């Protein structure tokens, strides 16, 4: 049997198109609606499209700053224990729910506004990496104070719908 000579070079553009890689979170109407249908039962209050877009923008600005954004359950719990002021953003499609089901109770107890976003993948993209993120805590900063106040005020007016 003869040896085969294989060309193992790949075109990078075809790989990224095939994987469906995205570089920014999307809030397109149809896609956002599809993501909202996949959330778990405790994901209340769920951000609407307009609010989600503002939240993604806030996360993007906070991730550029130093120590204004905390990511992950361990870091967010630490910030909540320290009574830090901020906004808590949770992903709505996390399974099992028990991983972070206690966080909304802590946020309500400490009067910290919180909101659910439909997709953990979109939340990770908003931070600036491809890794999904289930929980983010954004602290106020002078760089994005106006946007922070606008989002915090909108979150204070959200209500949890009874099932």
Curated annotation (Swiss-Prot):
One Pfam family here: Ribosomal_L7Ae
Keyword Cell wall biogenesis/degradation: no
Keyword rRNA processing: yes
GO cellular component: box H/ACA snoRNP complex; sno(s)RNA-containing ribonucleoprotein complex
Database matches in SUPFAM superfamilies: L30e-like
Principal localisation: nucleus
Record keywords: Nucleus, Ribonucleoprotein, Ribosome biogenesis, RNA-binding, rRNA processing
Subunit text: Component of the small nucleolar ribonucleoprotein particle containing H/ACA-type snoRNAs (H/ACA snoRNPs).
Family from the record: Belongs to the eukaryotic ribosomal protein eL8 family.
Described function: Required for ribosome biogenesis. Part of a complex which catalyzes pseudouridylation of rRNA. This involves the isomerization of uridine such that the ribose is subsequently attached to C5, instead of the normal N1. Pseudouridine ('psi') residues may serve to stabilize the conformation of rRNAs.
Protein name, per record: Putative H/ACA ribonucleoprotein complex subunit 2-like protein
Lineage start: Eukaryota, Metazoa, Ecdysozoa, Nematoda, Chromadorea
């Amino acid at each position: 049997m003869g040896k085969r000579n294989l060309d193992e070079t790949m075109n990078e553009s075809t790989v990224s198109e095939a994987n469906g890689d995205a570089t920014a979170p999307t809030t397109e109407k149809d896609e956002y609606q599809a993501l909202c249908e996949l959330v778990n039962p405790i994901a209340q209050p769920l951000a609407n499209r307009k609010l989600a877009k503002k939240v993604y923008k806030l996360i993007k600005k906070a991730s550029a700053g130093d120590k204004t954004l905390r990511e992950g359950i361990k870091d967010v719990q630490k910030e909540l224990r320290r009574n830090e002021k901020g906004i808590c953003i949770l992903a709505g499609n996390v399974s099992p729910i028990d991983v972070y089901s206690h966080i909304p109770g802590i946020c309500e107890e400490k009067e910290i506004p919180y909101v659910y976003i439909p997709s953990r993948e979109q939340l990770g993209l908003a931070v600036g990496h491809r890794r999904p993120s289930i929980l983010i805590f954004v602290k106020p900063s002078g760089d994005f104070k106006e946007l922070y106040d606008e989002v915090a005020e909108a979150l204070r007016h959200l209500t949890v719908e009874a099932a």
